[in-house]
Curated annotation (Swiss-Prot):
Cofactors required: Mg(2+)
Protein species of origin: Azorhizobium caulinodans (strain ATCC 43989 / DSM 5975 / JCM 20966 / LMG 6465 / NBRC 14845 / NCIMB 13405 / ORS 571)
The protein, known as: Phosphoenolpyruvate carboxylase
EC number of this enzyme: 4.1.1.31
Gene: ppc
GO biological process entries: carbon fixation; oxaloacetate metabolic process; tricarboxylic acid cycle
GO molecular function: magnesium ion binding; phosphoenolpyruvate carboxylase activity
């Protein structure tokens, strides 16, 4: 197996460019080590069975070989569940190790481009800044852009990250060892040691459980999210800010200019997202804020401690400022060896004040107050005071011939304080509008029995809410009895207010209303925030109230809703108090489940245009928050292309975007990858704002064509998913949706209530299930029908017209490019095996044949418009990556089908369910963006 398993890589790469040879070498190396590990740990029989299954799977997939199908069935049916588990683990780890090798190769190629002095690549800051310079945009205009900019990736805990943190840690160790091997010119002895370290790491990975034994809690998810600050954000966000400042200084003549504001903000929903998650409580929110705070304080203590060891400057050798001398004298450090070292003295004092701050914070957690520490050091009142002390050191170094020292760790810590404060992450609150409605109704009814808020129409509700918003009297009273839900909601919001009082407004700057439909949804949340002091009756708000428009209908209505909302004086006052900015969140997931990929993309685009026009009319600055998932079916795909495909005026220097599930780890678990992905977001935001003139508005006939395509695709999608008799049964039988609920991959339930209705199912498990069976249906269904109808109505020039749309319009080009990737990961041959799980043969044949026909139509249409002979012809690197995965991805699908048969026949055991869960993990790893 060691060489044969990876032979397919060599075959597919034959004659390929030399630049990819290191990737092939890494894959072979990891494959050989894993093969040796399997043989040593599990024996020759398992070792040989893996290879037999792989070869048979290739014949079935590549040649549609019916004999191979029967042979594969016989092989899989003869396996015991215990053997199946070992086979699954082997193929799953191939996926994980291939991902590591591929990520390492991306970093390798980026370094090679930099070393060679190649032209900067799209998506890099260097490219964006070069394009800006070529367009005549100088340092002053760039500074103005960054002064008003906000770029914010927001981490969410949606349950599509199926890897354990322990597994991720082992994989990071392997990645680091590969990186070291690449950079180190090793002696033979060092090479042997490196090989042994890799073997140890792979063996540890093999002996580490892939799956969690217990379901994640919200605080487990918080801890997972915090890992990415350690891996990437705490180091790379300040580094990126410093790089931009250096570029501007170079443009301005070489002297350091004013520091840029911390426009790159990492946000999080983890611990604050209550929509459908009953486990997010006031206590959980409080603990989340505490863990964030503790993590960043530990970072500052570590960094200041390192500065103590580094800045050993003696005052007899270098002059220091008066402020630095005074700060050193206040340190309290009387060690004789430090008497001549003012920077060290000052830093010891800063370190002691930080320790006093931590002690005071922990005392406040317990409801106590604390003044000076036992050693007399006062805690810092806020992060700004800590920054002010660091500034004294910085100015002294800069003024006394030590600028290069000032620009090292000290500079980065100062920028970290700007970005992360004492709170680390800006945490969003989110709740469903229905919950807000019930809470407000309860408060009103208890305060004035007979109000009967539930029975009021929208206009009457608006009138009540407007009156209450300007009434200084609180509604809630400790002497009245409320529902458990009302008490819980008020407790959460009071906890947010407490966090503001302790750590400042940036700790929880946003409150999001999911399923926002009308004016009252916004006013209800504002009223609840007023109850806890985050909104005042005089029209001031300490927090952004943000609607999330999710369904096709809500996207179509969002322009008129916001138009009327911004015209209300009571609400406009809140917006003005927040700097005249209003954020709107757009939901990619639910709109896709509601209307399909084509219609979702188009309605989102139109919603943005409508919002841009409304906000311009009201002279309010619009910030869009894009609720994108990892998969294309939930708005995923390359962030750079997606941002540049926005309509003119949609970005304007500010964007927030969710980073979900397995996408977080693939982007940010490695600092080099993390830096590159942060650059992509900043670069795309800069280019779409400052170079907007280069992006011509789409021709009116393109817009009309897209409207027509969307309507046809919408009808086709709705017809299948919501109007076809038996479709729900087909879905629940032919996918792993039932089994996903048993996998401990998130704290949130998979469905909003206990029903099999597609409407009640969350968008994430909906897409995840279609990915597992390799149909990826949410990422393409309806497109083929729409194109066929469009061309049929224009037999002469229909395709030519669509080709011009593809060439000239970034939105349409990105839409098709994402679909190209999704279709290439799909496999009708594999999906046909899942269809066998549907017990009703008539239902199975009727629906699968319909899906198959649409799939073929989608591919035919896509290739015609893109001018390709095969999928991903324009992206050979991605094509090769995906094809290289099939030999070890397809067997996991085949084994999953066999185990599902056993599990559902009541003949299954715990081993069977465990095997199914392992296949879910392995398939997700192979697809990389499955949920």
């Amino acid at each position: 197996m060691t060489s044969a398993v990876w032979a397919v890589v060599s075959e597919q790469e034959a004659g390929g460019p030399d630049k990819d040879q290191p990737l092939r070498d890494d894959i072979r190396l990891l494959g050989r080590i894993l093969g040796d590990t399997v043989r040593e740990q599990e024996g020759d029989a398992i070792y040989e069975l893996v290879e037999t299954i792989r070869q048979t799977s290739i014949r079935f997939h590549r040649d549609a070989d019916e004999a191979a199908r029967q042979e594969l069935n016989a092989l899989l049916e003869s396996m015991t569940p215990e053997v199946a588990v070992q086979i699954i683990r082997a193929f799953s780890y191939f996926s994980h190790l291939a991902n590591i090798a591929e990520d390492q190769h991306h970093s390798r190629r980026n370094r090679a481009h930099a070393v060679a002095g190649s032209a900067p690549r799209p998506g890099t800051l260097a490219n964006a800044l070069a394009r800006a310079e070529k367009a005549g945009i100088g340092a002053a205009e760039l500074r103005a852009f960054f002064d008003a900019a906000l770029v914010s990736p927001v981490l969410t805990a949606h349950p599509t990250e199926v890897r354990r943190k322990s597994t991720m840690n082992r994989e990071m160790e392997i990645a680091d060892l590969l990186d070291l091997k690449e950079r180190l010119q090793a002696t033979p002895q060092e090479a042997r040691e490196q090989d042994e370290k890799l073997r140890r790491a792979v063996l540890t990975l093999w002996q580490t459980a892939l799956l969690r034994k217990f379901k994640l809690t919200v605080l487990d998810e918080v801890q997972n999210g915090l890992s990415y600050y350690d891996y990437t954000f705490l180091a790379e966000v300040p580094r990126l800010l410093c790089a931009l400042e250096d570029h501007l200084a170079e443009q301005e003549g070489g002297e350091p200019g004013a520091e840029l504001p911390p426009f790159l903000r990492i946000g999080s929903w983890i611990g604050g997202d209550r929509d459908g998650n009953p486990f997010v409580t006031a206590d959980v929110l409080r603990e989340t804020v505490r863990q964030h705070r503790d993590r960043v304080m530990a970072f500052y203590l570590e960094q200041v401690g390192l500065l103590v060891t580094e800045l050993s400057l003696a005052k007899r050798l270098v002059a220091v400022s008066e402020d630095l001398t005074a700060l050193a004298e206040r340190s309290g450090d009387r060690a004789p060896e430090h008497r001549e070292e003012p920077y060290r003295l000052a830093l010891v004092g800063i370190h002691n004040r930080l320790k006093a701050t931590v002690a005071a914070q922990k005392a406040a957690d317990d409801g106590k107050t604390m003044g000076a520490a036992e050693d007399g050091h006062l805690p810092y009142p806020d992060a700004a005071a800590f920054r002010a002390d660091l500034d004294i050191l910085y100015r002294s170094l800069m003024a006394n011939g030590s600028a290069i020292l000032a620009r090292g760790r000290l500079r980065h810590v100062r920028r970290a304080v700007d970005s992360f404060g004492f709170h680390l992450a800006s945490l969003d609150l989110r709740q469903n509008s229905d919950v807000h409605e019930r809470t407000v109704a309860d408060l009103l009814e208890q305060a004035a029995p007979g109000t009967n808020y539930h029975a009021l129409d929208e206009e009457a509700r608006i009138a009540v809410l407007r009156a209450e918003l300007t009434n200084p009297r609180p509604l809630a009273s400790p002497f009245l009895s409320y529902t458990e839900e009302t008490r819980s909601e008020l407790a959460i919001l009071r906890t947010a207010a407490e966090a503001h009082a302790r750590l400042g407004k940036t700790v929880i700057p946003n409150a999001i209303i999911s399923k926002a439909e009308g004016i009252s949804d916004m006013l209800e949340l504002a009223l609840l925030l007023k109850e806890v002091g985050l909104v005042s009756a005089t029209g001031e708000s300490a927090i952004n109230v943000i609607p999330l428009f999710e369904t096709i209908g809500d996207l179509q209505a969002c322009g008129p809703v916001m138009d009327r909302l911004l015209a209300l004086p009571e609400y406009r006052a809140l917006v003005d108090s927040r700097g005249g900015e209003q954020e709107v969140m757009l939901g990619y997931s639910d709109s896709n489940k509601d209307g399909g990929f084509v219609s979702s993309g188009w309605e989102l685009y139109k919603a943005e245009i409508a919002l841009i026009e409304v906000f311009a009319r009201h002279k309010v600055k619009l910030r869009l928050f894009h609720g994108r998932g990892g998969s294309v079916g939930r708005g995923g795909g390359p962030s750079y292309d997606a941002i540049l495909a926005q309509p003119a005026g949609a970005v304007s220097g500010q964007i927030r975007i969710t980073e979900q599930g397995e996408i977080i780890s693939s982007k940010y678990s490695n600092p080099e990858n993390g830096r590159r992905n942060l650059e992509i977001l900043v670069s795309a935001t800069l280019e779409s704002t400052l170079l907007e003139a280069e992006q011509a508005s789409p021709r009116p006939e393109f817009l009309a064509a897209m409207e027509e395509l969307s309507k046809t695709a919408f009808t086709a999608y709705r017809s299948l998913v919501y109007e076809t008799p038996g479709f729900e049964d087909y879905f629940w039988s032919s996918t792993v949706i039932s089994e996903i609920a048993t996998l401990n991959i998130g704290s949130r339930p998979a469905s909003r209530n206990k029903t099999r209705a597609i409407e009640a199912l969350r968008a994430i498990p909906w897409v995840f299930s279609w990915s597992q069976c390799r149909l990826m249906l949410p990422g393409w269904y309806g497109f083929g029908t729409a194109i066929a109808a469009f061309v049929e109505a224009r037999p002469v020039d229909g395709i030519a017209f669509l080709q011009s749309m593809y060439r000239e319009w970034p939105f349409f080009r990105t839409l098709l490019s994402n679909m190209d990737m999704v279709l290439s990961k799909s496999s009708l041959a594999v999906a046909s095996r899942y269809a066998e799980l549907v017990p009703d043969e008539e239902l199975r044949t009727r629906i699968f044949s319909r899906i198959s026909a649409e799939y073929q139509s989608a591919i035919t249409s896509l290739l015609a418009i893109m001018g390709q002979k095969k999928l991903l012809e324009a992206n050979p690197l991605l094509d090769r990556s995906i094809r290289n995965r099939f030999p070890y991805l397809d067997p996991l699908n085949h084994i999953q089908v066999e185990l599902l048969k056993l599990h559902r026949s009541d003949a299954g055991s715990d081993h069977v369910l465990h095997g199914i869960q392992l296949t879910i993990n392995g398939i997700s790893a192979g697809l990389r963006n499955s949920g």
